[in-house]
Amino acid sequence: MVIFEKTRGKNSPSVMPSKKGDVSNIPTDMLRTKKPILPEQAELDVVRHYTQLSRKNFCIDTNFYPLGSCTMKYNPRAAHKYASLAGFLERHPYASAQSVQGTLECLYDLQNLIKELTGMTGVSLAPMAGAQGEFAGVAMIKAYHHKRSDFERDEIIVPDAAHGTNPATAKVCGLKVIEIPTKKDGDIDIEALDKVLGPKTAGIMLTNPSTVGVFERNIAVIAKKVHEAGGLLYYDGANLNAIMGKARPGDMGFDVLHMNLHKTFATPHGGGGPGAGPVAVNDKLKEFLPVPMVGKKDDKFVWLEEKDVSNTIGRLSAFNGNIGVLIRAYIYGAMLGGNGLTEASEIATLNANYMMARLKEEGFTIAYPDRRASHEFIVTLKPEFLNYGVTATDFAKCLIDKGVHAPTMYFPLLVPECLLIEPTETENVDSMEKFIQAMVEIRDIAKKDPQYLKGAPYNLPARRLDDVKAAKELDIVWQPK
């Protein structure tokens, strides 16, 4: 129920008296002709309404959240605490660099941390989300080729196991998408790659480990082939949480990458709030990095603008990135240090392999049974679909009833009826075992009463929604009657 539906018409809203301003310069077509529709609720009722709504949310603070390819790890409260210090929180975007030296030093150190972690030589913190970072990375690849007058290079190679944003980003940058298949063992089909490489190749976009949850074993071969063809390698940092301190994209041969700080560096996810997707490059692309960046001159930290970066692709936003998120990431990195970040990846990988082994032990089908999981893995429920008529969606809806957020469903698309499961390093054995037991119980229900699963969830404010109607009759703006 939305708060407007609780209106009883008895509590007229009151406002503190204020001096009326001059509205004579406001165009008449912008003036109200009738009173606004307000909920007419007392302050206590409003507080209770939204508090109760918040308790119905699934979030990391309340539930196990094994959403594959999303790295829903715990957001440490210390990072929130220190990022909320007045010196950070009250900094105005127009404040002079001289007056915010502490903030700039933190950002400068974060740039250096990302360089060390990824094996790159240049970093920009300007992108305000992972998708924007991805756009910046491909835009730099395009700018690189155009500077060399290689205007015919307008193709980006994207494996079928890539993130869905990869082909979208290439399209937005005006490039053509060339898809290549993944083999049954989870590695890229090298023969298929050979067939599409050529004078039109601008680059290839990869995630390593890939979205099928395994490490691409032929990455050195792929890098050599793409570079020999004149293309560049783009690293989607979605799965960087699996390899911190163990392997670096720059050492693998990648030329540019973006990081998702809400994944790898534990900054808050979603909610429509601010994101951050820094980009890192090798020497080939440093001159194209988006601005602003933080530099150091005569022991003072400064903003580097367009005049300071010769062939920058320019600004991505009006100001200087989402500083509050970047500060949280800096604090996270400082708290863990190099050894701690490495340990985080080790435990994330250990947890994923533990869950994969346990689910296999319980009789579930692993999509790539002969491969070790990275930080995530895929279960295919195709046998359950064929034997009992239940789908991955049915399992997911029933998991919610059991107090566990569902894993990612039907992604990647090349595995039928799949769940992509990522426990992250911040979960313990008890929470993972609770999930495994829930999966076993749901399968038992599927054997005895598959129709019951078709009706899940039963314990939430809303039951199974009509996905087809929602897609065909999209209505995202609610208005009171």
UniProtKB/Swiss-Prot annotation:
Transmembrane segments: none annotated. Its EC number is 1.4.4.2. The modification N6-(pyridoxal phosphate)lysine is found at K263. One of its GO terms (molecular function) is pyridoxal phosphate binding. Residues 1-26 are annotated as: Disordered. Gene3D superfamilies: 6.20.440.10, Aspartate Aminotransferase, domain 1, Type I PLP-dependent aspartate aminotransferase-like (Major domain). It catalyses: N(6)-[(R)-lipoyl]-L-lysyl-[glycine-cleavage complex H protein] + glycine + H(+) = N(6)-[(R)-S(8)-aminomethyldihydrolipoyl]-L-lysyl-[glycine-cleavage complex H protein] + CO2. Keywords: Oxidoreductase, Pyridoxal phosphate. Its cofactor is pyridoxal 5'-phosphate. PANTHER family: GLYCINE DEHYDROGENASE (DECARBOXYLATING), MITOCHONDRIAL, GLYCINE DEHYDROGENASE, DECARBOXYLATING. The glycine cleavage system catalyzes the degradation of glycine. The P protein binds the alpha-amino group of glycine through its pyridoxal phosphate cofactor; CO(2) is released and the remaining methylamine moiety is then transferred to the lipoamide cofactor of the H protein. The glycine cleavage system is composed of four proteins: P, T, L and H. In this organism, the P 'protein' is a heterodimer of two subunits. This is Probable glycine dehydrogenase (decarboxylating) subunit 2. The lineage of its organism: Bacteria, Pseudomonadati, Pseudomonadota, Gammaproteobacteria, Thiotrichales.
